[in-house]
């Protein structure tokens, strides 16, 4: 009985958190990833990045023009955050030396990282921070790993800025790594 109450309490807390994020940041209005839209709502995105920057759960914006991706990403991972937008899973803030790892669900071409498997070597990925600084990364490789393999997070030159994107391969439960 206690377990069920605890589970319900956590579920209710997570739902309230999701509702709060959606109402405070209106994330669904901001997404411009539909095929009919060529507009990137950068003014809206940058206004949410600048608002309450000390407690802002949004760390930045990820843009991948080659596959029409333009999303805010959360400063930290949680199951609730990941339902709403990509999340920083590991590493430094954008523009810092190290490997910033961003997770995004694969919603089969509807949103988030559905098409990262289509990226090619040298495709550009841009991260924007809350000061509107842009940090440019270029795809070095796209590959799959077993869903329990976290080695791509740690496999990088410690003296450079790296970005690793991770999403699910919805066919065989592997992870797609960029």
Residue ranges of each PLM-predicted region?
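Solvent-exposed, non-transmembrane regions of membrane-associated and secreted proteins
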Residues: 1-178
């Amino acid at each position: 009985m206690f377990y069920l109450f605890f589970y319900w309490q956590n579920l209710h807390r997570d739902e309230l958190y999701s509702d709060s994020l959606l109402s405070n940041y209106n994330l669904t209005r901001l997404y411009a990833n539909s095929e009919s839209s060529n507009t990137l709502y950068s003014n809206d995105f940058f206004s949410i990045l600048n608002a309450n920057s000390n407690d802002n759960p949004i760390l930045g914006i990820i843009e991948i023009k080659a596959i029409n991706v333009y999303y805010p990403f959360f400063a930290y991972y949680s199951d609730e955050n990941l339902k709403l937008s990509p999340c920083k899973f590991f590493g430094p803030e954008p523009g810092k030396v190290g490997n910033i790892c961003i997770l995004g669900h694969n919603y089969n071409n509807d949103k988030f990282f559905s098409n990262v498997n289509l990226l090619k070597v040298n495709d550009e990925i841009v991260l924007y921070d809350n000061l509107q600084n842009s940090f440019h990364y270029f795809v070095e490789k796209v590959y799959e790993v077993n869903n329990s393999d976290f080695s791509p997070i740690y496999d990088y030159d410690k003296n450079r800025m790296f970005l690793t994107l991770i999403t699910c391969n919805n066919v065989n439960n592997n992870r797609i790594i960029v």
